[in-house]
Curated annotation (Swiss-Prot):
Residues 99-148 form a coiled coil. The keyword Amino-acid biosynthesis does not apply. It comes from the Eukaryota. Residues 1-29, 175-235 are annotated as: Disordered. GO terms for cellular component: multivesicular body; multivesicular body membrane. Interacts with SKD1/VPS4 and LIP5. Interacts with VPS2.2. It is found in: Endosome, Multivesicular body membrane. Its main location: membrane. PANTHER family: CHARGED MULTIVESICULAR BODY PROTEIN, CHARGED MULTIVESICULAR BODY PROTEIN 5. Residues 20-29 have a biased composition (Basic and acidic residues). Pfam families: Snf7. The gene is VPS60-1. This is Vacuolar protein sorting-associated protein 60.1. Probable peripherally associated component of the endosomal sorting required for transport complex III (ESCRT-III) which is involved in multivesicular bodies (MVBs) formation and sorting of endosomal cargo proteins into MVBs.
Length: 235
């Protein structure tokens, strides 16, 4: 059957922009190397022209140098053409990469949009408002509880301005009664030190000279103390 209808040929995939750009860059680099070699030859011919005298020999050197120069110009034209192709391919590659980035961005945005829609289904603004209202109510109840717990007991609520003025007048009268001769209340006067010795009425400490009765002198020893009487010896 293959002989009659023929076998299907395997088609190769078309080259990508990057493959084509790499191949052209290699060709351009090869041409650039050839141009550098021709520059070296031209430098040699220039040195030979300086050393040779005008005549047939110098003309032969000029002819060879002219041939090398023509080859260089041809290679430079090919190099410029290849670099232009590379530039065009780079522009196309940049545009293609930009489109790929745009596609990926669109895909990411669609996925994010779908995810946000799913999240918005579980979060409703009405539920949030209701939650806020409930929290405000709870805070009000908490404030009332704290205020109730902080109340003071046994404080009369029927006090008015007359009661206040009466209390102040009574305090002023009490303070006037406590005011002493110098016009200063007793509670503002400095404290006086108490003479504890006079209150206790303690006698003065006896001295060595006043201990003996008047009219009779008492003998003292070398230390100022009363001398011990010596017993008399009987014969």
């Amino acid at each position: 059957m293959r002989r009659v209808f023929g076998a299907k040929k395997n088609t190769e995939p078309p080259p990508s922009i990057q493959d084509a750009s790499d191949r052209i860059n290699k060709r351009g680099d090869s041409v650039e190397d050839k141009i550098k070699k021709l520059d070296v030859e031209l430098c040699k011919y220039k040195e030979q022209l300086k050393k040779t005298r005008p005549g047939p020999a110098q003309e032969a050197v000029k002819a060879r140098a002219m041939r090398v120069l023509k080859q260089k110009k041809m290679y430079e034209g090919q190099r410029d053409m290849l670099y232009n192709q590379t530039f065009n391919l780079d522009q196309v590659s940049f545009a293609a990469e930009g489109l790929k980035d745009a596609q990926q961005t669109m895909t990411a945005l669609k996925s994010a949009n779908k995810e946000l829609k799913g999240m918005m289904k579980t979060v409703k603004i009405q539920d949030i408002d209701n939650l806020q209202d409930e929290m405000m109510d709870l805070m009000d109840v908490s404030s009332e509880i704290q205020e109730s717990l902080g109340r003071s007991y046994n404080i009369p609520d029927g006090l008015d301005e007359d009661d206040l003025m009466g209390e102040l007048d009574a305090l002023e009268a009490d303070m006037g009664n406590e005011t002493e001769a110098d016009g200063m209340p007793s509670y503002l006067q400095p404290d006086t030190e108490t003479d504890y010795d006079s209150e206790l009425n303690l006698p003065a400490a006896p001295t060595g000279h006043n201990g003996a009765p008047h009219g009779r002198a008492q003998a003292e020893d070398e230390f100022g103390l009363p001398a011990v009487p010596r017993a008399s010896l009987r014969g």
